[in-house]
Amino acid sequence: MMAQTGYGCVTALYDCRSKQEYIYRTNRIREISGGSELLANVYGMFFRAAEKKGLRINSDWRSGADFSVRSFAESGFDGEVIYEGGGNLFIMYKSRETYIRANRIFSRMLLEKTYTISVIAACVETTDNFKEDRTRLYNENSRIKSTDWISVPCNTLPITQVDRDTFMPIVKKEDNCSLSRESVLKRKAFEKSAEVGEMFLDDISGEENKGTESLLAVIYVDGNAMSKKVKACTENISGYTECTSALRRFSISTDKSFVERPISAIKAKLAERTDGRHKFRRVIAGGDEITLICNARAALDVVTAYFSALDEENRSLPDDQKNYACAGIAIAHSHAPFSDVYEIAEQCCESGKKKSRAQDSRVNYVDFHFCRSGITNDMETIRETQEAGLTARPYEVSAELSEFISAGQRLSAIGRANIKDLAAAMIKGDSYYRFEVERIKSRYPAAGLDSGDEKLRKLIFDIAQVYDIWFAKTETDEQEASE
């Protein structure tokens, strides 16, 4: 039987669901940026809305102060954030009535400020065992997810003009666009966001050079085996004070390792570039998960800078605390459906995780895919039907990715046309590939081509997929190579 020593308090869990759907529901890049801003700040907006309504929530959980159920119960606050991580928010309220009042404020704020962000709320009576309370919260959260239905806060009539993608009522016309309430709020959030060093997607996609610089990359990075680490940090403790302190330290450390330091490294890396193409913007960044959109030419620099920062951090950590992650890169034109492109990036990340799990999730992997002519299948189907036996992806970061980059730089000496011919010959058959290798070797003996090198063969195929954006020389160099 659970010990009821929670001073009448309740512990609540808030979980934003369908985050990617909310962000990528539109293909307008301003609204994607605005949607990501709203999601990033949704809990902060809740705290401010609650304060305006006279509900005091102590959200200063990062200060390092110890948490105590008794101290909270005797404080002047109505609620206190236990910790926030992975898109989840844990709060303790003084009573169930306070929890209900807070939810009413939160719901109204979501409707007025975001329109359709969906948040699942669950609460349990506080006991003296945090781990048991958290387990009950997760179970309740899962139950709500599986049984609840997502409602859209609008109704339409036969005379109502609706958005053709979301079927929400049109409330405003701006810049020759018909906008729903959700779109208006996302654009408003976009206009307010002007973080120095990160570019708006209009700048990233190169709208001024449509057709030549309109390639974007969606990069999804996710930490390996993080659920095990969360369990490990509270393995031999159960009280609220001990567990909360441990989880707060873990959440802050995770954010620094997977988001803050890598983002700083990416900014520093791209600042070295002067071609105007190397720009990026965060879409989601929290805990061990990060989603970026950048000019496709910058994707390789972004990923290498990210993992360099992660490796640098690991040098000062003991083996059992080192952090590892996998990244997926999906490249597409700026007019492609972003929701589909994101799913490909997520599946590329999962492709790396499958390999990493075979090594106890202690290896970083990168996978990529160029969405050339629309997205009609999932990654697994694409690999099985179009690239089986041809690709070496995913790449282990420290050795295999470096080898891939070196091979791409070395083979650029033979020119774009020859690299493309080699990849096309692989698809036709082994004899075609051997013929092309011998032909090119006769002109470029220093290129190191060998028709019997299976590893190099797969590298060449992968290089050909992204040669134009990651390895291509200038037009003058290409002309000289073909002469």
Residue locations for each model-derived region?
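Regulatory and interdomain segments flanking nucleotide-handling catalytic cores
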Residues: 1-483
